[in-house]
Amino acid sequence: MSSKLKYTDIDVPLDWLYKGKRRNRTKSAASTRTSEATTTSVKKTATLPSTAAVPTKTIASPQRPLSGQNVNNELSNSKPAVSAEKVSQQGQVPTRRTRSHSVSYGLLQKKNNNDDTTDSPKISRIRTAQDQPVKETKSSTLAEPIVSKKGRSRSSSISTSLNERSKKSLFGSLFGRRPSTTPSHVVERPLSSQNDHKKSTELPPIDTRQSKISTPTSTPTTASSKPSSSGGNRHSDGSLTSKLLSIPHNILETSSTNFNAHHHIQSHHSSGREQDSPHSESSDLPPILEKETTQKQLQKVSKVNLKRVTIAVQEFNSDPPQQLPSRKPKRGNVLIPEDMISAPPLISLGITNSSDQSSFQSNISPSYSKDSKEYKLALENFKKAAKEAEKHQKDAYYVAERMAQEVANYKARQLKTSPLTGATNSAADSATDQESSSLDARASKLHIDKPINVGAHPFETHQDDNIKYSSHLEQTLDVAYTRCCHLREILPIPSTLRQVKGKTAPLQTLKFLNPKPTLVDILSFCDFIAITPIHNIIFDNVSLTHDMFKIVICSLVTSPVVEKLGLRNVVINEQSWKLLCKFLLQNKTLIKLDISQTKARTDLNDSNYRDQMDWELFCEVLRNREGRPLEELLLNGLRFDKMSFSHFKNILLTFAQMNPKNPIRLGMANVEFSTECFDFLFNWMSEYNVQGVDLAYNNLESLAKRMIKKLARLPYKHLEYFTLNSTNITSVDDMSYILKYLSRLPSIKFLDLSNLPQLFPGILTSGYKYFPQFPQLKRIHFDFDDLSIKETTMLVSILAKCETLSHVSLIGQSPMPDASKISDSTDEPDKSKDEKKEQIVFMRNTLWASLYAFVRDSHNLVSLDVDYDQVPDEIQSRIALCLMHNMKRIMDSSFKLDELTVQDDLIFDGSLITETAEEVLKRLNDKSLLQNDVGKKYLLKKYFEKMEKVHHNVQNTIDSMFEKRKSGELPLQEKENLLRLLLLEKNLSNILDIFASMPNIADVVPFSKADNSFPNIGDSTVSANYNDGIRPSLKHLDSDRLINDVSIPENDSSIRPHLMATDSGRIIDVTTGKALLFKSSSNTSLAGKRQEEEEGELHKWGVFVQHQSSRHNSGLPSSANSSRISGSLTPDSSVAGGKKGESSRTSGTRPKILPKIPTGAELRDAIIKAKGIDSVDDLIKNVTSEKVGLESLYGDELNSRSPSNDSLQESQQKAPLQRPLVEDETVTKKYDKLLNDLSNVRHSKT
């Protein structure tokens, strides 16, 4: 059974749920982006010759319709619009309002997405280039750097001043720094400028709050149209920028961009009608794309190349030689002037400038400029050194040329002077060639000994070589990762090395924990993951450039086992998005994708936000993807309110329809969506096989009513996860309805109610009703709900009714009050301080006892998350032991606890109850503490139920242990536990008697089922026998059993020695005239009280005899002991026989069978009459004060028990090894004697 058991059968996995801090959702700090018209960035269009013929509507319209267009239309129709012609007639340029906001040129080509609270007037037209004079004013000149910053539509960092932007040089940004990885938008400016004058009135309205200045537009950037003003340089720079930047970044672009733009243009006029009626489309099917559109979408990634060379680490038998460079190399003595004024080269990115690297944009300004004194001095020295080096180089060249000429002349002169010598030399050369050819023939037959260093290991054998190579084939992953790093000549990253230390492939999860890696770190890490089978790869919160992102994607695209890729908060631009889509299209094993964006850098462009990505391409890739479909898609942190509803709908439908068989999970935590998206989300959850949707950290206070309606009307058969963590639901009634309808769902396994302190303790009443009704609830969280001790105790008592729970989390509650800190305050009197201390200690002990009881009684519970630093060590160990037993019980159905463990747990439970009984009694006497507190009444009632249950279990355990003792199967340790249980049972009986004798117990804790002031006990897990106050039939009868089962006649003088009379409502004794302690309606029996007094006297005498016997330091002989035990075990033996000693002296004879066993008062009278005393106290007094020996009472039995010292020493010398056995026998005999007496007392009650 254990081999087939899965983790999901025991607990609920939560690795896909979002865990983070709640963000402050104020309007001013909702995001680093502005929430007005600057929500989306302009898509880059291809610069083709045919683009000039495209109408202006194609350029100016947005690529996707925005969800807030109907709101913008209503606002623009309700308020007057200011035309651009009036502005041009006035001849004025709008002045900017602040330095932090600007309008980029790309925004003029898109319709703005305004919020519902927009109250600023709209203008229907933007000032164009024809409206501007030829000579620009100063204000328009200042506006130019804002438009052309890095060639992008707008900057997300709104804190940069205009003066800083105007000082930047375009050529310096091109050659002095690294070009941006994101596509530039400067190429759009000439296109729009050529067509702005044709249909300028068709431009969409913009918000005047965003249009701080008017953006002048230039004419097409040609050589013949350069203006004479300062703006001319700007245009020429822009043209050069478009030529330079369009080459490396347009490789992956195709003409499909124009088609997409045209496709959205066609639906632009009908977007208003679609927004007015959002459900006009079919909600069952995704938007149908034509076949040509599908091909165009896939063409965007057709040219994306994901090939990458991997390293065969297995081929390297040893590490390569290393020469590891320093990460912070020192600057050498030779200084090149260009290094002083230029940025670090790309090869040094992240290595030489790792300490100063704040981002990967290479925006580090040089330390010197061309006008600095140091640069001029270094340049002058460099020129001098260059001239001197050139001079030396020429001199060396001349010397070498002269030497070569002299050598040539010498050879020619030798040949002319001696012709015979030349013939001789030629003959010698031919002979030498023949000899060399013969030597080559012989050398070809020779072989070099392998290995070359065979002499280095003279004692190595072939067997050792085989062992070496076989161990190499099974190398661990840390060796492989270290070798990958050494091949890149770097040291391994410690955070990664710790994760793979001593592990072999395949690896379950690997996280890249370096938030700011260098390029060589990514290269070595990707070399490792490309050759190692890893199921989950996590890159959360890692700053990756586009090149790094491409390396990661290329290394994983051919992985046959990768199942999850985590890219949370990783910057993804347009190029990287296409790489991701191509990866999804080619990889066949990925089923879990995390592209959440819960936080972003302050300098991040709007085009790099997830809501601005090409989601149509993403959906098309999911439709055409081969292999396993996605089962888990995490979109946490996305701004769905900035996306069109059609895109949101298309994503969800595509994700669900591509995987109809397997359950799917969607992450929607910490997002922003409209009510329309929220309604569609819950409809989508009910129609498809949705296992869970993470809604944590969303403000659902205004959407709670909609949620209740959806849960009440729609079926959610497959829903297993429901998270309400940090959802800001404040209404207790709304949460009660949510719990009501969630309890009706058949498959809910996980419920998260964390970070909702405003609902407690009001929600506990509904929780008491609905939590036990969940059919399959396995895990529930109440983290950081600020629960007090009393509320936590009540919650634990409620959760004890949920039989299917396996994991409960109660982390981060209100801090426990410390009793020691109360003494520091001197304002209160000492009495009140002591009372508060006692109350705090009582509350803490009650909570620990409740937690322990909850764990012990919940047999399916395997994990309890609480703040254990405040829990006592003993309780911690008990809880851990119970959880371990529960786990064993789940894994093995035949597992059972041994008898010693059960007895120890029972004794511990009883001790916890008896320790708190005194404090409970004090609070029962004080009616003000419990008069109006329903919670305290409920806890008190649970306390009584618990006491009754423990008392019942103790009695059953005692009966079973006595049965084992009769058959001789009770070991010594269980005999000790039996004695403890007998004392515990007596203590619990006394406590119950005290509580039952209280006259106001019925007022404080109404036991009638008609009382609804707090939850009914009839719903508890305790059996109905406890609810009615009647205990099951037991062999051992206590005082409460006598109350209910024994009928006492009214005229029995032996039971009622005094006559009773009532006087003015008071019950008094006629003989004494004093008021009685109990009312006539009390359940306490006088017969029971008298029997307890007799039992106490016998117990007192037995303890006294045991104490006196222990002073003799003797053991009972085996013969006497056996006869005594045999006599005591027979039920027909006399009860007083153990004290008189006749049974020991006549052990050989058969015990006398009495016709009737004396019990109760007869037994007491018989003992007193035999000893000639009036009470047991007098008997003890005679023995202690009057020196009456026990020999006179028990005869010669004690003399036979105490051997002489000589015999004791001889026995010790003869058998020193038998001493432990003798001691064990002595202890066993003592326990047997005491248990015999207590057994006889128990029999006397029956």
From Swiss-Prot:
Modified residues (Phosphoserine): S102, S277, S1013, S1200, S1204, S1207
Biased composition, class Low complexity, residue ranges: 27-41, 154-163, 211-230
Cell compartment(s), UniProt: Cytoplasm
Alphabetized UniProt keyword annotations: Cytoplasm, Phosphoprotein
GO terms under biological process: endoplasmic reticulum organization
Residue ranges of the region described as Disordered: 19-241, 263-288, 816-836, 1109-1157, 1192-1224
Record field: compositional bias (Basic and acidic residues): 271-282
Entry-annotated residues carrying Phosphothreonine: T128, T1130
Polar residues bias spans: 58-95, 1109-1133, 1200-1215
Transmembrane segments: none
GO CC annotation: cytoplasm; mitochondrion
Quaternary structure (record): May interact with ribosomes.
Miscellaneous field: Present with 195 molecules/cell in log phase SD medium.
Protein family according to the UniProt entry: Belongs to the GIP3/HER1 family.
Its biological purpose: Required for HMG2-induced endoplasmic reticulum-remodeling.
Name of the featured protein: HMG2-induced ER-remodeling protein 1
Gene: HER1
